Curated annotation (Swiss-Prot):
Its main location: membrane. GO terms for biological process: amino acid transmembrane transport; basic amino acid transmembrane transport; L-arginine transmembrane transport; L-leucine transport; regulation of arginine metabolic process. The keyword Lipoprotein does not apply. Changing L334R: In LPI; failed to induce sodium-independent cationic amino acid and sodium-dependent neutral amino acid transport activity. Induction: Expression is stimulated and enhanced by IFNG/IFN-gamma. This is Y+L amino acid transporter 1. PANTHER family: AMINO ACID TRANSPORTER, Y+L AMINO ACID TRANSPORTER 1. Highest expression in kidney and peripheral blood leukocytes. Weaker expression is observed in lung, heart, placenta, spleen, testis and small intestine. Expressed in normal fibroblasts and those from LPI patients. Also expressed in HUVECs, monocytes, retinal pigment epithelial cells, and various carcinoma cell lines, with highest expression in a colon-carcinoma cell line. The gene is SLC7A7. Disulfide-linked heterodimer with the amino acid transport protein SLC3A2/4F2hc. It comes from Homo sapiens (Human).
Amino acid sequence: MVDSTEYEVASQPEVETSPLGDGASPGPEQVKLKKEISLLNGVCLIVGNMIGSGIFVSPKGVLIYSASFGLSLVIWAVGGLFSVFGALCYAELGTTIKKSGASYAYILEAFGGFLAFIRLWTSLLIIEPTSQAIIAITFANYMVQPLFPSCFAPYAASRLLAAACICLLTFINCAYVKWGTLVQDIFTYAKVLALIAVIVAGIVRLGQGASTHFENSFEGSSFAVGDIALALYSALFSYSGWDTLNYVTEEIKNPERNLPLSIGISMPIVTIIYILTNVAYYTVLDMRDILASDAVAVTFADQIFGIFNWIIPLSVALSCFGGLNASIVAASRLFFVGSREGHLPDAICMIHVERFTPVPSLLFNGIMALIYLCVEDIFQLINYYSFSYWFFVGLSIVGQLYLRWKEPDRPRPLKLSVFFPIVFCLCTIFLVAVPLYSDTINSLIGIAIALSGLPFYFLIIRVPEHKRPLYLRRIVGSATRYLQVLCMSVAAEMDLEDGGEMPKQRDPKSN
């Protein structure tokens, strides 16, 4: 009885219930994610997720360890170049493996379900909900604090506004994909314009002769290997997000062209903006002011913009809002693909029958973020995943090299020289080693969180469905059925129109 119910739910995409067919094709319209992300949307998604609040609030991490303006700018440039290498590797992976899910999909393709599940488990427990909750809290703090100029804003006020922000963006992305991309475009423009204002103000000051901070700019530099490593690590953390578009590969129009082109446009934009923004900061503020500031851009605005200094706190809030939207889009697709591959409950990979949005996965992601908002010391959780993040990014690139060897004749619309993935792999070894050395306890906790998924994988995921406990099958079947009705959703069909794609994998049957 239970099994038949589940198969009935899964078969419903074949029912002729798609009223939105445009008449171009004789059969019923497929229920799958639609290709609605254009080149411009792709650029805004990457830029919007890479440029968060960090460049406004705390770009001083690089300066602390480099100890000079000159060396810090060099490290920002090196961090940008390294990120370009990683983004180019992901461009090849995204055009070769045309599945959403970024590193999860690539690890699954190269190494199978076990490592892919551990990557998904880490994202589910720590990376995605923690980062989204923190971005939402930062947004709320910058919106609420001006109302309490002489004291700290109430804890409940910022958390409630953060929750409202998560709910609003979840609703927008549930309604229409186009609404989500429109929000992303608008808020990306806003944050870029704010940084351009900072850059222009700095250049004007520099043109007026305020160049004293750049005299002997390398004086006092710390060339110790450990300090340079930590400075570079801080820079690379600010550049994270270049893989955002790979989470939505199946929704990109003409991905063979637009995915690598979006990456190729976005990376120079962000790198140049980061370097010039720091030049502007260094022109106006001395090292002591920067290191003492809790929000460098706000300190900069107080000295430059006068009565218009409110622009920067507002820009930080807008930047967080856009970054949160990009994170919600990416994370929901990760959970969607994880469900489709059998690593999460089937209900999460369903799609709204009229709007063609992954409503269940968006709701699941939103609920997880709201739960983590209830954690009072949530900022501590962010320290646990640096090791895991870079480990799985590096493992994806190792998978790229492995697939080059295992499947040399596989169609690759974009094929890089092996120089790029090899260099990136060597650098990720460094990025994995740095947190183990500098933040050993938190890194070990992060590893333990990742390994906590082992019992779940071997006792549930790897067990064939008919051998799972009857009560569990009944609960999952009932939840799937009710969620399907509640969300007006059916199981998504796999998009196989691109050559080389494999049909839906279910982990218990793999290997």
